[in-house]
Curated annotation (Swiss-Prot):
It comes from the Bacteria. GO terms for cellular component: cytosol. HAMAP family: OMPdecase_type1_B. It catalyses: orotidine 5'-phosphate + H(+) = UMP + CO2. The active site is at 63 (proton donor). Substrate binds at residues 12, 34, 61-70, 117, 178, 187, 207-208. SUPFAM superfamilies: Ribulose-phoshate binding barrel (SSF51366). This is Orotidine 5'-phosphate decarboxylase.
Length: 227
């Protein structure tokens, strides 16, 4: 995998019209484009189709978490939109993950989100998950891969432990990535792009450091050069 192919640019914009100049600028420099909740809530499957027309696979980051039947139907609809990857919450349980895989079909890789990168140990304890984040992440990763998930989403702090737990097959996608010197924002468990890849990340998700850069394409090239 070329360094640039490891970068997923997040289209964190309220509309595709707002996202399009950025998406067109970075698409030649990255491997994937991510449509998240904000953009999907505004424009639905049309946002996925528009992003896909730029020639990169689309990562639809909806973090589905509901009863298995509902998630299966939602995954089927996501597949019809043209998404190549789709996220669900591993905490929804093995049956929900299995349902997502059934609904998505063979053309879409289902990724299971473990613990959000905005949560630290204190935040996890407050919702009843005592102990270090790594323990919860590894437990959820094993559950999801056992249920058929094709990949795991985890922070750079846990990616090495997840790789050791699930083996070489699943795709490991890592948000919470910030170039050296960049602001953490609302992320609690972060690392630089190079640190994440060295730890075992296959794909790094980069949002604000690209979106807010004066020259997003140049920023993407700089990240790729450091991998």
């Amino acid at each position: 995998m070329k360094p640039s192919e490891r970068i997923c640019a997040a289209l964190d914009f309220p509309t595709f019209a707002a996202a399009e100049p950025f998406a067109r600028a970075v698409a030649p420099e990255v491997g994937l484009l991510k449509v998240g909740l904000e953009l999907f809530a505004a424009e639905g499957p049309a946002a996925v189709r528009a992003a896909a027309r730029l020639g990169r696979p689309v990562f639809l980051d909806l973090k589905l978490h509901d009863i298995p039947n509902t998630v299966e139907g939602a995954a089927r609809s996501a597949a019809a939109s043209g998404a190549a990857l789709l996220t669900v919450h591993a905490a929804g349980g093995a049956e929900m993950v299995k349902a997502a895989v059934r609904g998505a079909g063979p053309g879409v890789r289902v990724l299971a989100v473990t613990v959000l990168t905005s949560l630290d140990a204190a935040a996890l304890d407050a919702v009843g998950l005592a102990g270090p984040p790594e323990a919860a992440v590894v437990r959820l990763a094993r559950l999801a891969v056992g249920a058929g998930a094709g990949g795991i989403v985890c922070s750079p702090h846990e990616v090495a432990a997840v790789r050791a737990a699930v083996g070489p097959g699943p795709l490991l996608v890592v948000p919470g990535v910030r170039p050296a010197g960049a602001a953490k924002g609302d992320q609690a468990r972060v690392a630089t792009p190079a640190e994440a890849v060295r730890a075992g990340a296959d794909v790094i998700v980069v949002g604000r450091p690209l979106r807010d850069a004066p020259d997003p394409a140049a920023a993407a090239r700089a990240i790729a050069a450091g991998l």
